[in-house]
């Protein structure tokens, strides 16, 4: 059986564009991109995920000399290699190496010592709001998004690449969840090094059908014949997987140190998850059976499994009520200086706060003290984060996405 063309669905029902949003910016800057990438040595951290692998797909068009990819997901690296090797339009450099490891490991540091990378892009990040369910999950997230990123920057400062990129998120603008504020801290961290070597980042929209996303979950639930659950009141900006890699490549190569890139998307381009879900079922030719609760949806699913009748598929639409959930999206804050003229479809925040490294070290010490206190809980770390990042207004409902299907 040939599976449906998800990329076609994305173009027709989510982004509503047949051509990449960044096609013109790529074309206008193609000579600059080729000059900076061709015959260069590249390291991609977290390259097995959707955004990292899309960055690689965009990058190899410009003929780098070597490509090293690091990710903790060994199976993901295997699939990345299979996909790249199986694509007749992709030409990998002769030196193409993948290593399943953490970028916080000593073995990884040996890779940095062994190779002289011209371009380094870091996509290793906790990206889910659900990662703030308790202090243990929050510590793991901040360890990855902040502490390990700090150690990497310290290591690179003695032998910096020409271009360093570290991915961020739209949720870093006026953050209301711990994931967003952890990325805001990461932005402050990289800005504190931006005078020493060239560092850029990008905030962008949801990546449609990215690994682990709600929409990707729809496919997994369908494959398992399990019911689907979807918020009815949440709207998001979306880019395609292809576009997610392209915005990161443009930011990495073309940006000035300290720049934060974001896509030019207007309020009229926000898309409701409920609309996407209904359109997806229509695209698949499956009728939805609307359910008022998860319990009802699971009961219908069990019945369907027994009868083998899946002509109507159980879907529970619900109003969002979990901690840290933002019902709208924004890419920049009120006092940001934004350049909307340099690129066709990209905006750039040019005046980001650049703290001193000593301030960042003090913030990290403060957070580690909270984590080391055995009596600390989620509220303790939220309070510490609120004192460090001004404007952080955490939305706490006492409910986590891990409590939902």
Map each language-model feature to its residues.
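A short, basic/flexible loop-to-alpha-helix module at the beginning of a structural domain
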Residues: 16-40
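Strand-loop microenvironment adjacent to phosphate/nucleotide-handling motifs in alpha/beta enzyme folds
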Residues: 32, 192-213, 219-405
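N-terminal Rossmann NAD(P)H-binding glycine-rich loop of SDR-like oxidoreductase domains
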Residues: 42-62
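SDR active-site strand-loop-helix element
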Residues: 45, 70, 120-124, 164-169, ...
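NAD(P)H-binding glycine-rich loop region in Rossmannoid oxidoreductase-like domains
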Residues: 58-69, 85, 92, 101-143
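Helix N-cap at the beta1-alpha1 junction of Rossmann-like dinucleotide-binding domains, i.e.
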Residues: 71-76
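Hydrophobic/aromatic anchor residues within beta-strands of the central parallel beta-sheet
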Residues: 98, 141, 164, 199-202
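Conserved Rossmann-fold NAD(P)-dependent oxidoreductase catalytic core, especially the SDR/UDP-sugar
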Residues: 122, 126-131, 135-143, 147-184, ...
């Amino acid at each position: 059986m040939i599976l449906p063309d998800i990329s076609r669905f994305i173009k027709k029902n989510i982004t509503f564009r047949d051509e990449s949003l960044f096609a013109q910016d790529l074309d206008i800057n193609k000579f600059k991109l080729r000059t900076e990438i061709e015959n260069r040595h590249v390291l991609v951290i977290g390259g097995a995920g959707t955004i990292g692998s899309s960055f690689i797909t965009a990058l190899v068009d410009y003929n780098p000399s070597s490509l090293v990819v690091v990710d903790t997901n060994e199976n993901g690296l295997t699939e990345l290699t299979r996909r790249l090797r199986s694509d007749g339009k992709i030409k990998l450099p002769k030196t193409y190496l993948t290593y399943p490891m953490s970028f916080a490991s000593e073995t990884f540091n040996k890779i940095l010592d062994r190779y002289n990378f011209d371009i380094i892009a870091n996509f290793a990040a906790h990206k889910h709001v659900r990662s703030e369910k308790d202090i243990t999950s929050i510590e793991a997230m901040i360890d990855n998004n902040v502490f390990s990123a700090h150690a990497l920057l310290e290591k690179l400062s003695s032998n910096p690449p020409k271009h360093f990129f570290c991915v961020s998120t739209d949720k870093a603008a006026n953050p209301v969840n711990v994931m967003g504020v952890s990325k805001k801290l990461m932005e402050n961290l990289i800005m504190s090094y931006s005078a020493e070597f060239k560092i850029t980042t990008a905030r962008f929209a949801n990546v449609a059908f990215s690994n682990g996303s709600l929409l990707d979950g729809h496919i997994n639930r369908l494959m398992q014949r399990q019911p689907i659950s979807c918020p009815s009141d949440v709207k998001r900006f979306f880019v395609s997987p292809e576009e997610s890699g392209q915005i990161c490549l443009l930011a990495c190569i073309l940006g000035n140190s300290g720049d934060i890139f974001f896509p030019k998307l207007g309020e009229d381009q926000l898309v409701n998850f409920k609309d996407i879900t209904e359109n997806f079922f229509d695209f698949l030719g499956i009728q939805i059976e609307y359910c008022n609760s998860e319990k009802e949806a699971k009961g219908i699913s069990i019945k369907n499994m027994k009868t083998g009748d899946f002509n109507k598929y159980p879907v529970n639409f619900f109003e969002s009520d979990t901690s840290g959930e933002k019902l709208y999206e924004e890419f920049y804050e009120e006092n940001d200086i934004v350049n909307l003229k340099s690129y066709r479809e990209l905006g750039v925040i040019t005046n980001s706060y650049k703290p001193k490294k000593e301030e960042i070290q003090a913030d990290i010490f403060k957070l580690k003290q909270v984590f080391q206190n055995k009596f600390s809980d989620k509220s303790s770390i939220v309070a510490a984060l609120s004192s460090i990042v001004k404007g952080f207004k955490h939305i706490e409902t006492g409910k986590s996405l891990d409590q939902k299907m």
